[in-house]
């Protein structure tokens, strides 16, 4: 069973790194993905040892890493608003690790403890569904895209998939309309400086619709 845990860590790490390219600050989730890949690679080496790690070791490791990742991910999801990937992927590890530990102890638990363990497992799964829904399905980071646009503008990265133009084009939000004029103004100034009159006029009209400068 240890090999399955190793594969899960590697797949999760590679997926996070791949999806991080579509985040305003890709380095945040990339670091987490690299940590998962390192855990997986170390696990591959450990599985070939004379005494490979037990399932309980992997379950405990996933519970610890997943729990810590959920805390860090929720901070980014709700406070810094810089990343939406760490929390849901950490939740997967937390569910796999903690539910695995409960399953191994199921036979020696009393009836009351089994009920409590079942409620805990259901709570963890419900929390993971929320993290996936909140982070991967509806997670939007308009403020972070604006910040990333300003950072890339200072670095001189204007064009391209991760350039300032692309970032500001994503920095709008229906619920937080106060962010939209800043994005429109930045887009109007950048396109005007590049000599794209039609694009500049389009963003200028959007800016006027929001009340102007």
Place the predicted regions along the sequence by residue.
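Residue at a conserved register position within TPR or TPR-like alpha-solenoid repeats
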Residues: 145, 152-155, 191
